[in-house]
From Swiss-Prot:
Pfam families: EF_TS (PF00889)
Main location: cytoplasm
Encoding gene (name): tsf
Gene Ontology MF term list: translation elongation factor activity
Protein name: Elongation factor Ts
PANTHER family named among the record's database cross-references: ELONGATION FACTOR TS (PTHR11741), ELONGATION FACTOR TS, MITOCHONDRIAL (PTHR11741:SF0)
C-alpha cells in the first residue's frame, strides 16, 4: 500500500465523485493509486452515493434573501434540491442561512468562491438527506435603501431605491416585479442595439399592411410602446393599481428605483 498520493489524482477523483478530499486521498492510498479501483471501492463502501446524487436533477429548492440591518447591503441566493419535501427540511434551510450569513460577513462576491467555501458542508448535507443539492447562484446588491419580496420561496426580488423612502411603496414595487417580471428599470437602461433590432422587426411587420409611411410610423411607435411596457418596470401598469404605471407611482412619492434583481426557481437567467 502506498503512503503518498499525487495531488492531481486526488483532484481527478474528487471531480468524478464529489467525495471529500480526505476520503479521496484515503481511497487512492487503499487502491495503490488506481483511480478506477478507488471508485469501485467507494461504491462498495457507500461513499459513491455522493457521485450518484451529484448527477441527479435538482428541480426544486429555495430562494432566500438576507439584508443587513442598515438596509444598504443584501444578498439573494438560489439553492436547489430534488424535491419540495427536502426544500422544507430544517437542515436544508439552516444550510441556506449559513451560506448567506457567511457570504455577507466575508464579502464573498463570486459564485465559484462560494461553492468552494461550502463544498464540504454541501456534501455532508447530501449524505444526510439523500438528495443532490446545488448552490446555483447568488447576487449581492448594494444601495441607499434595499427592500425585498419572496413569493412562496420560489420567486425572490431584491430592490435598491433612493429618494424619499416609503417602505410600503418600495415593498409593493418588489411585489410587482415578482408578478410582472420586467427586465429593465427604465427605457434608458435598454441597450441601443435591442431598441434598433425591435424597431426593425416591428417595421417589417407593419409594412405588410401596405399603409402610407406616416401611418406605418405610428403603427411602429405603438408597437414599440407595447414592447417597452412589457419589459420596462416604469412603463408597466402597477399591479396594485392597473390604472397607473409604476413610473407615475414612483414620481408621486419621489422614489427612484436604481436597480433590482429577480430570481425564480429553475429559470434560465
Amino acid at each position: 500500500m502506498i503512503d503518498h498520493v499525487n495531488s492531481d489524482l486526488i483532484r481527478e477523483l474528487r471531480k468524478r465523485t464529489s467525495v471529500s478530499i480526505i476520503k479521496c486521498k484515503q481511497a487512492l492510498i487503499d487502491s495503490n493509486g488506481d483511480i478506477e479501483l478507488a471508485i469501485d471501492n467507494m461504491r462498495k463502501s457507500g461513499l459513491q452515493t455522493d457521485f450518484i446524487q451529484s448527477n441527479r436533477l435538482t428541480p426544486s429548492g429555495l430562494i432566500a434573501i438576507k439584508i443587513e440591518p442598515n438596509k444598504q447591503k443584501g444578498l439573494m441566493i438560489e439553492i436547489n434540491c430534488e424535491t419540495d419535501f427536502v426544500s422544507r427540511n430544517s437542515m436544508f434551510r439552516e444550510f441556506i442561512n449559513t451560506v448567506m450569513v457567511t457570504a455577507l460577513n466575508e464579502s464573498i462576491n463570486n459564485i465559484n468562491a462560494l461553492k468552494t467555501r461550502f463544498e464540504e458542508q454541501r456534501l455532508f448535507l447530501m449524505n444526510k438527506i439523500g438528495e443532490n443539492i446545488k448552490i446555483r447562484r447568488f447576487f449581492v446588491l448594494i444601495g441607499n435603501f434595499l427592500s425585498s419580496y419572496i413569493h412562496r420561496s420560489r420567486i425572490g426580488v431584491l430592490v435598491s431605491a433612493s429618494g424619499k423612502i416609503n417602505e410600503d411603496i418600495i415593498k409593493h414595487v418588489a411585489m410587482h416585479i415578482a408578478a410582472r417580471n420586467p427586465k429593465y428599470v427604465g427605457v434608458s437602461n435598454i441597450s441601443e442595439d435591442i431598441m434598433i433590432r425591435e424597431r426593425h422587426i416591428q417595421m417589417d411587420i407593419a409594412k405588410k399592411f401596405k399603409k402610407d409611411p406616416e401611418i406605418l410610423e405610428k403603427i411602429v411607435e405603438g408597437r414599440m410602446e407595447k414592447f417597452m411596457s412589457e419589459i420596462v418596470l416604469e412603463k408597466q401598469d402597477f399591479v396594485m393599481d392597473i390604472n397607473r404605471t409604476v413610473g407615475s407611482i414612483l414620481d408621486e412619492y419621489c422614489i427612484k428605483i436604481n436597480n433590482f434583481v429577480r430570481f425564480e426557481i429553475g429559470d434560465n437567467n
